[in-house]
């Protein structure tokens, strides 16, 4: 990677424009939204549909695309890695993960690291990740000076962690009064839990896929969910 260090954010941004670095891409090169959708649709087809017998049957499909969090305030982190300690100022939603990240990058123990949680602004879950913390730590460790990393809106949009693409199918049986008697649904989307908490990778579905699925619906006699995580 490339880091441009200057005495102002503007100077750093202009210097990076002059460098105009080009990156070939990693192991996801060639991956497109179309290919991802094809995989999810295939998984959904594997689940199949449940036959619903009722006076009226609604059979619908919904799809939401990958969505950027678009934090209202720039992604930023200030880090100062010294010879025997580290101090971090960061708007984070996950202090323990930030601590683990700092320990991994610096090699320091927990008692050698101090984290100041600043005001978050509009985080929307994006600041649960620590990639921007890693950047500040690596540069500060190299320079042995305090460094503030600030992402431009363009960088934030290109390199964010996106809310997942999801495809859902519903079959709802209604009586002659229009009240639901049977609710069947199939959902296919990436398993965020396995990504965010690798130790939970053994779980072949993400309960967060359908939060309402954990609740009972006393007004609907029959309801059934099928989830396929990718």
Language model: regions and residue ranges:
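Structural alpha/beta core scaffold segments of enzyme domains
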Residues: 1-230
């Amino acid at each position: 990677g490339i880091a441009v260090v200057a005495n102002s954010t503007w100077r750093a941004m202009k210097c990076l424009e002059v460098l105009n670095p080009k990156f070939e891409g990693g192991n996801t090169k060639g991956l497109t939204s179309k290919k991802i959708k094809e995989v999810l649709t295939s998984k959904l087809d594997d689940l199949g549909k449940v036959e619903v017998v009722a006076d009226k049957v609604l059979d619908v499909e919904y799809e939401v695309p990958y969505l950027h969090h678009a934090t209202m305030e720039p992604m930023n982190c200030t880090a100062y890695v010294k010879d025997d300690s580290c101090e971090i100022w960061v708007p984070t939603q996950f202090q323990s993960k930030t601590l683990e990240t700092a320990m991994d990058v610096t090699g320091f123990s927990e008692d050698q690291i101090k984290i100041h949680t600043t005001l978050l602004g509009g985080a929307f879950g994006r600041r649960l990740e620590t990639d921007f913390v890693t950047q500040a730590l690596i540069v500060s460790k190299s320079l042995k000076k305090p460094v503030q990393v600030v992402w431009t809106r363009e960088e934030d949009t290109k390199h964010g962690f996106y809310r997942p693409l999801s495809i859902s199918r519903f079959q709802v049986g209604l009586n002659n009064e229009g009240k639901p008697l049977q609710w069947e649904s199939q959902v296919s989307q990436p398993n965020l839990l396995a990504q965010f908490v690798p130790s939970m990778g053994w779980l072949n579905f993400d309960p967060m896929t359908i939060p309402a699925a954990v609740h009972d619906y006393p007004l609907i006699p029959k309801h059934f969910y099928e989830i396929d995580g990718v």
